[in-house]
Design a protein with these regions (language model features):
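Active-site segments that bind and position negatively charged phosphate/pyrophosphate groups
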Residues: 1-92
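C-terminal charged capping/lid subdomain of soluble metabolic enzymes
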Residues: 82-151
């Protein structure tokens, strides 16, 4: 339903597909948010989103939470070296018009260190299977930039 739901949303049309996607997001997020401790309701993709909220250019261009989190998923998969999964998400993002590179969210390589610093200031990766560092985030974002240039 995702592709049609997004197209319907952009066309300001309420359809069964859009309704089902919205309900799925609200129900799953609501359940997770209420059944687990706060440290487990977020992760690295959200940390990356939070990092980008510190950029004036990202805020001024009104990028949606889910758009930037979808980019954060690419960063997460790059850090974890899950390249096959990254390729699937990358192709999905491209097909849906979701961000795959910095310029898609009005950011530049000069912004990356600031994003990484802010990403680590919240609770998002406070309890994580491994320590996440600024350099890991910076390196993953720059690797994604290279991947975009090659694809």
């Amino acid at each position: 339903w995702g592709e049609k739901a997004l197209a319907d949303c952009r066309a300001h049309k309420v359809t069964e597909e859009l309704t089902e996607v919205i309900l799925g997001i609200i129900v799953s997020t609501g359940l997770v948010s209420n059944f687990v401790q706060v440290d487990y309701t977020t992760g690295l993709a959200h940390a990356v989103y939070n990092g980008f909220t510190g950029l004036k250019s990202t805020e001024e261009n009104h990028h949606l939470h889910g758009e930037v989190v979808s980019y954060g998923i690419l960063v997460l998969l790059t850090i974890d070296k899950q390249y096959e999964e990254r390729e699937k998400v990358f192709n999905f993002n491209r097909s849906m018009g979701l961000p795959t590179k910095l310029s898609d969210i009005h950011a530049t390589p000069d912004d990356v260190r600031t994003v990484a610093e802010k990403a680590l200031k919240g609770i998002d990766v406070r309890k994580y299977p491994y320590e996440v560092t600024e350099d890991m985030i910076v390196d993953a974002i720059m690797e994604l930039e290279k991947y975009n240039a090659e694809h």
